[in-house]
Design a protein with these regions (language model features):
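Hydrophobic transmembrane alpha-helices
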Residues: 1-14, 19-125
Length: 125
């Protein structure tokens, strides 16, 4: 659960710093954002999985706290994140950069390839 909070905190801090200095056409493609298109949402998912794991370890059975993951994950994956991506792709100044980014980086859950990409850094692209 703590790991999830830290991932979300770092992703949100990077997003705030990017938003303060971005130019038209820019896409955030640094740090955690090189491994996941929505690492702040990944952090929330990790928080709920960790919370469910704590409940399992403490009580030996899944209980209603596990619903947090489902109630967060399902709307995120089916509605919120696709809408955010559609808005990004509809911005004429950044559509080319975003489509390239979208092709290279998974929606939420990092893959081995996206993790390797994150460690290589932007200069390797």
């Amino acid at each position: 659960a703590v790991l999830g909070l830290e991932v979300a905190r770092r992703a949100d801090a990077a997003l705030a710093a990017f938003a303060a200095t971005r130019k038209p056409g820019d896409v955030l493609d640094a740090g955690l954002w090189r491994a996941s298109r929505h690492p702040n949402h990944l952090g929330e998912q990790l928080f709920w999985v960790g919370f469910a794991g704590l409940a399992l370890a403490h009580r030996g059975a899944w209980d209603p706290c596990c619903l947090g993951f489902l109630l967060n994950h399902v709307p995120d994956t089916l509605a919120t994140l696709p809408l955010i991506d559609a808005r990004m792709a509809s911005d004429t100044k950044r559509v080319r950069n975003f489509l390239k980014y979208e092709a290279a980086v998974p929606l939420i859950y990092p893959t081995p390839a996206s993790i390797a990409r994150a460690f290589r850094g932007a200069k390797a692209d």
